[in-house]
Amino acid sequence: MPDQKEAQRTFAARWFEEVWNKSRREAIDEMFPEEAVLHDGSAKYRGPAEFKLFYDALRAQLSDVRVTPLETISEGDMVCTRWSSTAKHSSTGKDLVVTGISILRFEDGRLVEAWQNWDQQGMLQQLEEPASKSFSQAAG
């Protein structure tokens, strides 16, 4: 039986692989429970239905998404993964590279809260958009 830290690290790796790399939208229902909250910058998504709004909007703008976990640290009830992602911007066809950090918090082995910060300004620069625009304004 894996210990708590190993189970949390395995969950994080599976999250990136199933949800993002394999585009298994149904994995969100399996892995992101109703009580879970994602904090993405100033936005907040509660439960799988709200998370899917974020996911679908992002996937509509990006194809060929590939997330590569670079480093993962597990301590107590939290896991932090530094990652790099590649994707193709659907409207322009430009290849993008984005880096970020995701922090996951667990209770009783279940994901309950997540925070992610990613280089939105770097993505906008790759799209050659003014930094004053948000990603959703530039990509839409």
Describe each PLM feature range.
Residues 55, 67-73, 85, 99-104, ...:
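Hydrophobic/aromatic beta-strand elements that line small-molecule binding cavities or substrate pockets
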Residues 113-140:
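Low-complexity, intrinsically disordered terminal/linker segments enriched in charged
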Residues 60, 64, 86-97:
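Short, cysteine-centered beta-strand-loop-beta hairpins and adjacent loop/turn segments enriched
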Residues 35, 82-88:
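Generic short beta-strand segments
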Residues 1-30, 34, 130-140:
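Short, low-complexity N-terminal intrinsically disordered segments enriched in polar/charged residues
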Residues 5-7, 25-77:
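A solvent-exposed, acidic/Ser-Thr-rich amphipathic alpha-helical stretch
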